[in-house]
Amino acid sequence: MTTRRIVTSEKSTLDYDGKGAPEPSNTSPAVPSSVIWKLMSFTFAMITLPIGTYFFTVNWVFQGNATYAGGLAALMANVVLIAYVIMAFRDDQEEMREEAEKSKKKL
């Protein structure tokens, strides 16, 4: 039979920290908060605007005709989506202009 040797002075590989001292972590978000705010706003609009349009028009504008109310609600969903895409393109163009100005200043 073999016996296990117990030595308290030996260190295993788990006892060594190979990385050294920890560096401060960068916890800032990768996406600017303005972009997140716009996304959340358009998400809220995408949920509430078509549903609100449907119920408003089915009860007061079209007097119970759900077909026209549903069509108008679908149109409003597309309006919100197109508005978000246009705003995203504008934000991207602004970022590209800022980067171009920074590169011109470096030269």
From Swiss-Prot:
Coiled coil: none annotated. A motif (Prevents secretion from ER) lies at residues 104-107. One of its GO terms (cellular component) is endoplasmic reticulum membrane. It is found in: Endoplasmic reticulum membrane; Endoplasmic reticulum-Golgi intermediate compartment membrane; Cytoplasmic vesicle, COPII-coated vesicle membrane. It holds the Pfam family VMA21. Its main location: endoplasmic reticulum. The chain crosses the membrane at residues 42-62, 69-89. Belongs to the VMA21 family. Required for the assembly of the V0 complex of the vacuolar ATPase (V-ATPase) in the endoplasmic reticulum. This is Vacuolar ATPase assembly integral membrane protein vma21. The gene is vma21.
